[in-house]
Amino acid sequence: MELLKLLCLILFLTLSYVAFAIIVPPLNFPKNIPTIPFYVVFLPVIFPIDQTELYDLYIRESMEKYGAVKFFFGSRWNILVSRSEYLAQIFKDEDTFAKSGNQKKIPYSALAAYTGDNVISAYGAVWRNYRNAVTNGLQHFDDAPIFKNAKILCTLIKNRLLEGQTSIPMGPLSQRMALDNISQVALGFDFGALTHEKNAFHEHLIRIKKQIFHPFFLTFPFLDVLPIPSRKKAFKDVVSFRELLVKRVQDELVNNYKFEQTTFAASDLIRAHNNEIIDYKQLTDNIVIILVAGHENPQLLFNSSLYLLAKYSNEWQEKLRKEVNGITDPKGLADLPLLNAFLFEVVRMYPPLSTIINRCTTKTCKLGAEIVIPKGVYVGYNNFGTSHDPKTWGTTADDFKPERWGSDIETIRKNWRMAKNRCAVTGFHGGRRACLGEKLALTEMRISLAEMLKQFRWSLDPEWEEKLTPAGPLCPLNLKLKFNENIME
């Protein structure tokens, strides 16, 4: 009996401690910034609320007043930042605010098993090895596959129109195009998502993403250590997908020695592995992250671009169509003022990853003049909040206004660079760790949108509920568009 009472007491104390750790931030967290209630992160799972609405209702006021808040996510309390000067400090002082990805933050999770240790999440000498291996392939690439895939996408849309399908869900199609783009441009093989309607590789990836990005397990990743059948299957599927992906790269680049004559990012990774700069797991991790990040962010941007062109079809869709008509060389698209101002505004309005928490303090430090952060605390940034901050963007911060970037291409480029340097736009992050794929992603957007504009007019499906994603990547939720073709003048 006494033993039973003792066990009950231990269980009660344990549960009380866990509840306290979830409800209340650690006592050594800064007291001079607000705490966002722990339950806020769960609201999109319970109610039909998207992440921009969540930000406006529960985070915006505190974030805009203080520039930083305490925020519960991923089984822990974090410091979440949006003020530009704080972000500039974080990006500049990487030795204090060190990159710390899922492989360190939640190494026991299915998500960490999926992406591993890679060029996005690594730190120090290891990161430099990764960066040296992949930079050339991501910065200097052949854009011909992107042009070809944009035409294939348009053909698929036309086929659906011929079948009488006037309202078309764009998420699956844009994902298929983005997968083929990154695989052909950076990995040296054709994923085949556009040309094969039932692509086993693609279906495997979709299944994994549903398992890994389940909102509940993202919020409580420690549950992945429990013998839950669905999580055990998630780990098994992750291992299988990684093996299939690397085998495909081996078949296309290694076994035939093609990597020796090519400059794909994957080719450079293989050379780094052969020269013993990186090991086999690091090779696999970086091939996986190139595919994952290299298709997700362009897919999200493309969907947001299509959405905004549909929403403002009478103005911006018509303006851009007139500008791109007659442009036959894809490289000329980079010099079009309206197209580029539009794209930069899309990135500002809807950064593909609205919230990123992947920095960890290596020592007790001060953020700004007054916010003292203990050692070992995860610090993240709310990209949506930064690019919608009225202190930076004025009273039109929430308005879609591509003209804010300028009227000529030189001014537009200058303002884009300045906004990134001032950390006013962090969709591609900043500092030394700025996204290596920015050039590739924007090239994909220019070519794909130009081809769409030449071949179609489109509008929002009246039956589609105008809503953004509830959590995670930011874009229109299950976007549906109505198309008409034969619009070239």
Swiss-Prot record:
It comes from the Eukaryota. Its cofactor is heme. GO terms for biological process: ascospore wall assembly. The keyword Nucleotide-binding does not apply. InterPro entries: Cyt_P450 (IPR001128), Cyt_P450_CS (IPR017972), Cyt_P450_E_grp-I (IPR002401), Cyt_P450_sf (IPR036396), Cytochrome_P450_monoxygenase (IPR050121). It holds the Pfam family p450. The keyword Protein biosynthesis does not apply. Heme binds at C435. It is an enzyme of class 1 (oxidoreductase). GO terms for molecular function: heme binding; iron ion binding; monooxygenase activity; NADPH dehydrogenase activity; oxidoreductase activity, acting on paired donors, with incorporation or reduction of molecular oxygen. Signal peptide: none annotated. Its EC number is 1.14.14.-. Keywords: Heme, Iron, Metal-binding, Monooxygenase, Oxidoreductase, Sporulation. GO terms for cellular component: endoplasmic reticulum. Belongs to the cytochrome P450 family. Involved in spore wall maturation. Thought to catalyze the oxidation of tyrosine residues in the formation of LL-dityrosine a precursor of the spore wall. PANTHER family: CYTOCHROME P450, CYTOCHROME P450-DIT2. This is Cytochrome P450-DIT2. The lineage of its organism: Eukaryota, Fungi, Dikarya, Ascomycota, Saccharomycotina.
